[in-house]
Every structure is written in C-alpha cells, then in structure tokens.
C-alpha cells in the first residue's frame, strides 16, 4: 500500500465468538461477506494503534460474521480487540461497474446545479433503503437523492464535479 493511499473503512470487531480466538465482525460491505475478499486489512484499535493483517479467514454464521486472524487463538486476545476498525486500501477494491460508484470516490467532489450554481462539496453519503443520498456541505448542508437522471445529471472525476438538477434554495 502506498503511504498516502486512501483507506476505506469496511467494518469493525464487535466481540468474541467462542473460546478459541474467533471474532465477531460488523461489515459494511455489500454483501457483508465481501469484507473477506479485500485484504490485507489495516486494523486500528480504539487507542489508535495500527497493524496490517493478511490471511484472515471468515464465514457467515446466522446473524454474525465470524473471522479468524492468524496468530489469535484465545478469547482474551479477542476481547482486547473489541472496537477495532477494519480498513483496506482503496486499490484493494475492484473497479466499479459502468454507472456505479464507490461512495468514497464521490466524497470531496464539488457539486453544482445544471445552471452552474455552486452548492458545495460532497461530505458523505448514506442509504435510505430506496436510494442513496449525497450530503453536500457549502453555505449550508443539503441532502440530495443520488438518483440518475432525476436529480444527478453527471459525475465527472476529471473535473472533480457532480452536476445536479436541484433548486439551490431547497
């Protein structure tokens, strides 16, 4: 991984499973088991200590994801890892399909209306279940449905710009 490469937060350790060092994970990938495809992991403890972990194995077990870290063999070690965040380098993810985007790639893009009114910068995105919403921070915060072609007209990474059909007073 390059020194300044962007990291993507994929999940976190939420507890121990059994007594042999297995961990329960919360995954924000879709599907949730995809977290195991992207390695090595950069893990950051709640205290800020980071390390790189490769060779993590895992499985879907009911409502939990269970993982095995190389060298972790007891419950006490796992309990000390509770709250640890799991990251990967952006380059570990496959290229998105045409007309699909990774949220992280949209963050920090400029947003303006089809009339050229600058609305601000993408702060983050979230899902409502029916569609994604882009949160734009400028003179104020706006939440714009990330829906093509109704509201989002174009995404241009070279120009660092998203063009939307949106009333700037809304």
Swiss-Prot record:
Transmembrane segments: none annotated. GO terms for cellular component: cytoplasm; ribosome. Keywords: Chaperone, Cytoplasm, Ribosome biogenesis, rRNA processing. One of its GO terms (molecular function) is ribosome binding. GO terms for biological process: ribosomal small subunit biogenesis; rRNA processing. Residues 98-170 form the PRC barrel domain. InterPro entries: PRC_barrel-like_sf, PRC_RimM, RimM, RimM_N, RimM_N_sf, Transl_B-barrel_sf. It holds the Pfam family PRC_RimM. It is found in: Cytoplasm. The PRC barrel domain binds ribosomal protein uS19. Belongs to the RimM family. NCBIfam families: 16S_RimM. An accessory protein needed during the final step in the assembly of 30S ribosomal subunit, possibly for assembly of the head region. Essential for efficient processing of 16S rRNA. May be needed both before and after RbfA during the maturation of 16S rRNA. It has affinity for free ribosomal 30S subunits but not for 70S ribosomes. Binds ribosomal protein uS19. This is Ribosome maturation factor RimM. It comes from Xanthomonas axonopodis pv. citri (strain 306).
């Amino acid at each position: 991984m390059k020194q300044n490469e962007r990291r993507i937060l994929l999940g976190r350790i939420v507890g121990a499973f059994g007594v042999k060092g297995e961990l329960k994970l919360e995954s924000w990938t879709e599907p949730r088991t995809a977290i195991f495809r992207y390695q090595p992991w950069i893990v950051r403890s709640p205290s800020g200590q980071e390390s790189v972990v490769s060779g993590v194995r895992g499985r879907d077990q009911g409502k939990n994801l269970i993982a095995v870290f190389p060298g972790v063999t007891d419950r006490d070690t796992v309990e000390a890892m509770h709250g640890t965040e799991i990251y990967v380098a952006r380059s570990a993810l496959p290229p998105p399909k045409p007309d699909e985007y990774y949220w992280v790639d949209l963050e920090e893009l400029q947003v303006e209306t089809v009339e050229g009114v600058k609305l601000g910068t993408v702060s983050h995105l979230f899902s409502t279940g029916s569609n994604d919403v882009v949160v734009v921070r400028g003179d104020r915060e706006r939440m714009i449905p990330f829906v093509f072609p109704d509201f989002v007209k174009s995404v241009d990474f070279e120009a660092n710009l998203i063009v939307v059909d949106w009333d700037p007073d809304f």
